Swiss-Prot record:
This is Uncharacterized transmembrane protein YxlG. Its main location: membrane. InterPro entries: ABC2_NosY/YtrC-like. Keywords: Cell membrane, Membrane, Transmembrane, Transmembrane helix.
């Protein structure tokens, strides 16, 4: 237990030293802020964009607060996903290249201790950053649009946090596979993008994939209730996260040298 606590403290301090605990929440807040403001001011943006015939009027139906929140989640599913992957991609690869891993593993530290400590702290940072951005989006939606349900917001936040954990786990797995930071990022982004595309292309046959959690969160925002296969989606998402985490530990143990 002492070993795990020491590693957790190390990872948390590393988050401060690298600036990750500062730039990631700020970046997520910018992502969350952009969508509500863009939608709200879209008529003015189009009107002042020029190249419109004289006398032409633009008809723009203002979406509901829930629809804006769904649009914001879609934004997090692209830019947010990349930001989380970039924050995780060097977790193992950088320390191996700098010789830090060899120093840590020369002490009574197991592969499980090493990987799990990184997974826990990176997940906490990712969820905190997403919550900051999503919470800011909710604030502006309530300010600029119709009142959005807080219970729906909280439920969608909790569900999407599980997707953030999956993204973190995928990025960490990529960092254990490749020593190159770029290759690790490509692996993490490729895996999460493939899962998302599969759910979009095969909506009926891919309900068990973790990206279905995003659809569940959107359904709750719009309808205030769970969609079909909610239990299966939740169960298999947790299972996929566990399998990826176990794979990362297994891959780390197979290193011939750190």
């Amino acid at each position: 237990m002492k070993v795990m606590m020491a590693l957790l403290q190390k990872e948390w301090l590393e988050g401060w030293k690298s600036g990750k605990l500062i730039w990631l929440p700020i970046a997520m807040m910018i992502v969350g802020l952009t969508q509500p403001l863009t939608i709200y001011y879209m008529p003015e943006i189009i009107a002042h964009g020029g190249n419109l015939p004289d006398g032409m009027k633009i008809s723009f139906t203002m979406p509901s607060g829930s629809e804006v929140m769904v649009s914001t989640l879609s934004q997090f599913n692209t830019l947010g996903m990349a930001l989380v992957i970039f924050s995780v991609m060097g977790s193992v690869a950088n320390e191996r290249n700098q010789g830090v891993t060899a120093l840590i593993m020369s002490r009574p530290v197991t592969a499980a201790h090493y990987i799990v400590s990184k997974w826990l702290i990176q997940s906490v940072i990712g969820i905190m950053s997403f919550a900051a951005g999503y919470g800011l989006a909710y604030y502006y939606v309530r300010l600029l649009f119709e009142d959005a349900s807080f219970s729906r917001f909280a439920a969608s936040l909790g569900l999407y946090a599980l997707w953030v954990i999956f993204i973190v786990t995928a990025g960490l797995a990529g960092s254990t596979i490749f020593r190159s930071v770029g290759a690790a990022a490509a692996c993490g982004i490729g895996l999460t993008a493939a899962v998302s595309f599969a759910v979009s292309l095969f909506p009926d046959g891919a309900k068990w994939l973790p990206a279905e959690i995003c659809k569940q969160a959107e359904h709750i925002l719009l309808h205030g209730e769970r969609a079909d296969f909610f239990g299966w989606s939740l169960t298999f998402s947790i299972l996929c996260i566990m399998l990826l985490a176990v794979f990362s530990v297994w891959r780390f143990r197979r290193y011939e040298s750190y």
